[in-house]
């Protein structure tokens, strides 16, 4: 079920405050966050946000095409290494 329009998008307060402070100072610094559920809003464009994936913070440069998506969509948490090759010789 989608979020109600009257509520607006969810963005963590601490993250929004950091971005607004950087916009006022006209600075570009990497912002570290654990908030994967935060929605990308237009004020974030041009910033680099390091999103935690469970092991490390992955830096993500925010572009205009990412608006409306969640930060966690761009930091994969699982590492798929492919299916194991069936090796019949090693079974004998």
From Swiss-Prot:
UniProt xrefs under NCBIfam families: rpsS_bact
PROSITE patterns: RIBOSOMAL_S19
MF terms in GO: rRNA binding; structural constituent of ribosome
One Gene Ontology cellular component: mitochondrial small ribosomal subunit
Xref: PANTHER family: RIBOSOMAL PROTEIN S19P FAMILY MEMBER, SMALL RIBOSOMAL SUBUNIT PROTEIN US19M
Alphabetical GO biological process terms: ribosomal small subunit assembly; translation
Disulfide bonds: none
Keyword terms: Chloroplast, Plastid, Ribonucleoprotein, Ribosomal protein, RNA-binding, rRNA-binding
InterPro entries given in the database record: Ribosomal_uS19 (IPR002222), Ribosomal_uS19_bac-type (IPR005732), Ribosomal_uS19_CS (IPR020934), Ribosomal_uS19_SF (IPR023575)
Family affiliation: Belongs to the universal ribosomal protein uS19 family.
Protein task: Protein S19 forms a complex with S13 that binds strongly to the 16S ribosomal RNA.
Protein name, as recorded: Small ribosomal subunit protein uS19c
Location within or outside the cell: Plastid, Chloroplast
Lineage: Eukaryota, Viridiplantae, Streptophyta, Embryophyta, Bryophyta
The encoding gene: rps19
Chief location bin: plastid
HAMAP family on file: Ribosomal_uS19 (MF_00531)
